[in-house]
Amino acid sequence: MSVISMKQLLEAGVHFGHQTRRWNPKMAPYIFTERNGIYIIDLQQTVEKLEQAYEFVKKLAMEGGTILFVGTKKQAQDSIKEEAERCGMFYVNQRWLGGTLTNFKTIRGRIQRLKELKKMEEDGTFDVLPKKEVIKLRKEKERLQKFLGGIENMESLPSALFIVDPKKEAIAVAEARSLEIPIVAIVDTNCDPELIDYPIPGNDDAIRAVKLITSKIADAVIEGNQGEQFAASEE
């Protein structure tokens, strides 16, 4: 039983690539044809590549690994958050803060600050502070929550990244590569698939297409976690 059907991919518009003038020649092997100035992605390869990515993610989760879901473009923000939360993983869906991986210690410091501010709000500290001070602290907390909320409980570097549009998330790609963290990504016809360990050729601009593929990666995590629990109960 394959992870995904051609019918599902077609219905979600995964086959629509970018305009022919906006392409990366390295994507040529994944292009089926050109229609009305738009490249059409070869969905048979999408099925195959998604299966490879699924197996990788499932195995990783089974071994207790973590995945960081990354997608900051409008079309990806909701899916990235929803699917990462559904499978109990971490996410970045606002802005990728430079150094999120390569300067993780500093980022952990900012997360610590976020936790402190939340505690102050909960334990009544805000009630005894001057109003002006509280407004300032609340603003700081909201900003930190916006950018770091999805990685608040990420205690160590992730085992892998799942990225929607690695061209847009070039900094995340560069950081992961420098730390040799494997990358799974949806690669559209304007991306460089050679930078990605598990490229999944597909439309990264349609909400439905992004949701479909992201949900499959989350399913792989869930299936892997069930395997991990099963293995633990067998011991």
UniProtKB/Swiss-Prot annotation:
One of its GO terms (biological process) is translation. GO terms for molecular function: structural constituent of ribosome. It comes from the Bacteria. Transmembrane segments: none annotated. Keywords: Ribonucleoprotein, Ribosomal protein. InterPro entries: Ribosomal_uS2, Ribosomal_uS2_bac/mit/plastid, Ribosomal_uS2_CS, Ribosomal_uS2_flav_dom_sf. One of its GO terms (cellular component) is cytosolic small ribosomal subunit. The keyword Metal-binding does not apply. The keyword Iron does not apply. Belongs to the universal ribosomal protein uS2 family. This is Small ribosomal subunit protein uS2. The lineage of its organism: Bacteria, Bacillati, Bacillota, Clostridia, Thermoanaerobacterales.
